[in-house]
């Protein structure tokens, strides 16, 4: 392979883009140990639709891709220990329509992460004193605390949500109580100290770390869109905005030896999910990786249900219903799609896609091999071709407030030999599917959950619970094997299940809630 080189630089965005443009297929870009600084002024800015990360008001976010790989084939970026540092509110890396790309051996950092943090130093009566992290700038204006975003813009207290973690970060939960909003006054104490006054005694514990973010996912971490054969290996992600690694309409993804954990002295490493896989196909592998400090699920794998609005012969007209997912086309010519009853999630009929196109921001027009014969009262469409065969093994998941893994894929899937350290009120592994809220499809057909270790779950550890009508007894998930897992300090039940058949499980019946399946 042809060798290219690029040295560390304190302002390398434009030159780095130029070097990428020089690269031919079958080549390697070699970096070296040192700091590579990318600034927002050099980022490629353009509107772009991202699954589960669009504005819920129908406005398409303008993204700022600090490193943009578009249409590249058979290349490797080998960091050799390089540090990528990002200044401003940007998306670190975009891969668009790429094939056979390897990213390895570098780390991702932000000078000012999009999640601000402060640690409770002491409290006395209705007063509480905090120490802001060194990379969380703030101002006090009219006796109120305003965090500054990565572009230096104050975030109104009303726009930020809160999360509270123990000092070591293993307990890391969302909080309905928001100190920034609840404070009746605020004052600066020295360079990084913050004194907040409340109407009643502060409920937190000394040492707790409070985290704050505006939940808009206007930027993401590493995006793979319409790519194939993408490998991420030996990457250290100290912070990612939006969805950490988001792959949509991509095939053949292999992520190995990732460390998605925060900088020393911080709690948060991921603004939302660590990894989000939406409407992908082929093989997905996540192996030998560590995750800690997410504000949402460490791993989410799903397709998308679209509402069937009308049928005209072989032509059907669909609509995205989830407010953050629209403007993408998760169908290709030749795909096999299912007509699904939106209440029971039962697949009723199957057809082949002859043509697919977007219609406006929220619509999709499909031409099918033949019309559906009998439409239910509430119908949604599921793309049976846009599911990966997923393997998740030998990973560690800790310090997150929601599910550890959410998986609704009709491919052949396995979750093996992972460790989950979990203390939230959500299931650790969630096999769901719904056509009423997130619209994340669909029914599992082949899943193994084996050899995992679960520690400290505050709710049912594994939930196989599709969001169907309460009266529905129809099967949604099938062919699931749960064997050889260990549970330590976990709440009852270890397994909650319904609308499932062909379930093989060695969990004692006393620790199971619901039917073991048909």
Language-model features, listed with the residues they occupy:
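Acidic Gly/Asp/Thr-rich repetitive segments characteristic of extracellular carbohydrate-active
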Residues: 2-29
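Extracellular beta-strand-rich solenoid/capping regions of secreted or surface-exposed proteins
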Residues: 17-21, 38-76, 85-104, 112-126, ...
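The right-handed parallel beta-helix/beta-solenoid scaffold, focusing on the short coil/turn
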Residues: 27, 34, 65, 73-75, ...
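Extracellular beta-strand solenoid repeats
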Residues: 30, 68, 76-78, 85, ...
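Short glycine/acidic-rich loop motifs that flank beta-strands on beta-rich extracellular proteins
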Residues: 40, 86-92, 112-116, 218-221, ...
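Ser/Thr/Gly-rich low-complexity blocks that favor extended beta-strand/coil architectures
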Residues: 63, 86, 110-112, 121, ...
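Consensus "Asn ladder" position of solenoid repeat domains
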Residues: 106, 235, 258, 289, ...
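Small/polar beta-strand repeat architecture
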Residues: 172-217, 349-350, 354-390, 398-399
């Amino acid at each position: 392979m042809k060798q290219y080189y690029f040295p560390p630089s304190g302002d390398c965005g434009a030159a780095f883009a130029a070097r990428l443009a020089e690269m031919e297929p079958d080549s390697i870009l070699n970096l070296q140990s040192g700091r590579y600084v990318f600034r927002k002024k050099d980022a490629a800015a353009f509107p772009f639709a991202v699954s589960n990360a669009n504005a819920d008001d129908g406005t398409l976010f303008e993204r700022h891709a600090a490193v943009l790989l578009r249409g590249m084939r058979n290349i490797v970026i080998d960091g050799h220990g390089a540090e990528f540092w990002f200044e401003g509110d940007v998306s670190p890396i975009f891969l668009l329509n790429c094939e056979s790309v390897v990213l390895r051996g570098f780390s991702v950092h932000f000078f000012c992460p999009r999640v601000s943090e402060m640690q409770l130093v002491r409290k006395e009566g209705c007063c509480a004193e905090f120490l802001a992290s060194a990379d969380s700038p703030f101002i006090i204006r009219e006796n109120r605390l305003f965090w500054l975003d990565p572009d230096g813009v104050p975030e109104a207290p009303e726009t930020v949500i809160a999360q509270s973690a123990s000092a070591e970060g293993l307990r890391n939960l969302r909080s309905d109580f928001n100190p920034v909003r609840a404070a009746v006054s605020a004052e600066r104490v020295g360079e990084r100290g913050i004194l907040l006054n409340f109407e009643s005694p502060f409920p937190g514990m000394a040492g707790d770390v409070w985290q704050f973010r505006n939940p808009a996912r206007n930027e993401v971490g590493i995006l793979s869109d319409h790519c194939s054969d993408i490998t991420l290996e030996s990457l250290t992600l100290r912070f990612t905005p939006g969805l950490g690694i988001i792959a949509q309409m991509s095939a053949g993804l292999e992520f190995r030896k990732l460390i998605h954990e925060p900088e020393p002295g911080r709690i948060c490493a991921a603004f939302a999910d660590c990894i989000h896989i939406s409407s992908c196909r082929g093989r997905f592998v996540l192996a030998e990786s560590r995750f800690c400090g997410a504000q949402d699920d460490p791993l989410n794998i799903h397709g998308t249900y679209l509402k069937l609005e009308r049928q005209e012969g072989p032509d059907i007209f669909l609509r995205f219903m989830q407010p953050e997912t629209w403007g993408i086309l998760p169908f290709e010519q030749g795909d096999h799609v299912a007509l699904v009853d939106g209440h029971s999630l039962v697949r009723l009929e199957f057809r082949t896609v002859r043509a697919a196109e977007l219609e406006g921001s929220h619509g999709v027009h499909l031409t099918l091999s033949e019309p559906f014969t009998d439409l239910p009262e509430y119908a949604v469409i599921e793309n049976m071709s846009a599911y990966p065969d997923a393997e998740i093994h030998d990973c560690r998941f800790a310090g997150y407030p929601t599910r550890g893994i959410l998986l609704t894929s009709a491919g052949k899937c396995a979750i093996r030999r992972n460790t989950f350290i979990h203390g939230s009120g959500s299931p650790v592994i969630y096999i769901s599917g719904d056509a009423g809220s997130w619209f994340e499809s669909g029914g599992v057909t082949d899943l193994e959950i084996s050899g995992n270790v679960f520690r400290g779950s505050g709710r049912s550890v594994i939930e196989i619970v599709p969001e169907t009508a309460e009266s529905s007894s129809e099967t949604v998930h099938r062919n699931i094997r749960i064997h050889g897992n260990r549970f330590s300090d976990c709440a009852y039940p270890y397994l909650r299940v319904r609308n499932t058949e062909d379930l093989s499980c060695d969990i004692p019946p006393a620790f199971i809630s619901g039917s073991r399946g048909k």
